[in-house]
From Swiss-Prot:
It is found in: Cytoplasm. Belongs to the EF-Ts family. Coiled coil: none annotated. The keyword Cytoplasm applies. GO terms for cellular component: cytoplasm. It comes from the Bacteria. Keywords: Cytoplasm, Elongation factor, Protein biosynthesis. GO terms for molecular function: translation elongation factor activity. This is Elongation factor Ts. The gene is tsf. Transmembrane segments: none annotated.
Length: 294
């Protein structure tokens, strides 16, 4: 029997939004397997798929850059330990210079940046180390992506915590900005349903089938229920299937058709996405719940 720790229960609660005891019971039944425990809870509760990748647990900034002609651009995430440092001007400028460098050199592998010149006589790594010494926190270049296109790039930064880069053809600059803002707000996983990973789709199908089976309805009805839920799931996670945030009566797919436009791809970065850091207050949270139950 695997040991079920408080941090495991906390993580499952964040994934599902369900109660502490429900999560602990599911983890025990799943012998500590987080994914299996989540599936158990979803089958029982009818909950939607978690957005595990959206758990925010690190500090830092998203920075981006697009050339004036809209043909080259880059997004980068630089992490630190506290929001205080994330607001530091030198830290913010470092991230901005990285985005420009990545766009200029068309680099998406951040490991290749270390020895590149970012300032007169200084490399990326030397500037990073100097910031660590000055600010007293670990600073890491977590990820980045560069774009070169024959069409158009649009970028949207929501403060410094969310960044979107989109590659599109047709329409105008206003459309590009609207699409980028929509992605930041609605957080699609991919452009179209054929890009949804097969294993993710199969997992949803199995869970929907198990949920529908509990209704006790005939097999043919269950099959229709499952297909309906799959269609809804695909509409939720794909850009083309989502209702446009500025006009929910039309989908992004319909919007693009009216503008004779097409989206080739996009990148969405959220600061700390998928990173977990040690939490010191979970014990206090548990004690508070115990006290309330007395």
């Amino acid at each position: 029997m695997a040991e079920i720790t408080a941090s495991m229960v906390k993580e499952l609660r964040e994934l599902t939004g369900l109660g502490m005891m429900e999560c602990k019971k599911a983890l025990v039944e799943a012998d500590g397997d987080m994914k299996a425990a989540e599936d158990l809870l979803r089958i029982r509760s009818g909950a939607k798929a978690s957005k595990a990748a959206g758990r925010i647990a690190a500090e830092g900034v998203i920075s981006g850059f697009v050339t004036a002609d809209g043909k080259q651009g880059a997004l980068v995430e630089v992490n630190c330990e506290t929001d205080f440092v994330a607001k530091n001007e030198d830290f913010i400028n470092f991230a901005g210079n990285l985005a420009r460098l990545m766009a200029d050199k068309n680099i998406s592998d951040t490991a290749l940046l270390e020895d590149m010149s970012i300032a007169e006589g200084e490399t990326v790594e030397s500037v990073r180390k100097a910031l660590v010494m000055k600010l007293g926190e670990n600073i890491s270049i977590r990820r980045g992506i560069s774009y070169q296109t024959k069409d158009h790039l649009a970028m949207y930064l929501h403060g410094s915590r969310i960044g979107v880069m989109i590659d599109y053809a047709g329409g105008d600059e206003a459309l590009g900005k609207d699409l980028a803002m929509h992605i930041a707000a609605s957080k699609p996983v991919c452009v179209s349903s054929d890009q949804v990973p097969a294993d993710a789709l199969e997992r949803e199908r199995q869970i929907f089938t198990a949920q529908a089976a509990e209704s006790g309805k005939p097999a043919n009805i269950i099959e229709k229920m499952v297909e309906g839920r799959i269609a809804k799931y695909l509409a939720e996670v794909t850009l083309l299937g989502q209702p446009f945030v500025k006009d929910p009566d039309q989908t992004i797919e319909k919007l693009l058709k009216t503008k004779s436009a097409k989206v080739s791809g996009f990148t969405l970065y959220i600061v700390g996405e998928g990173i977990e850091k040690k939490s010191d207050d979970f014990a206090a949270e548990v004690m508070a719940q115990v006290t309330q139950s007395k």
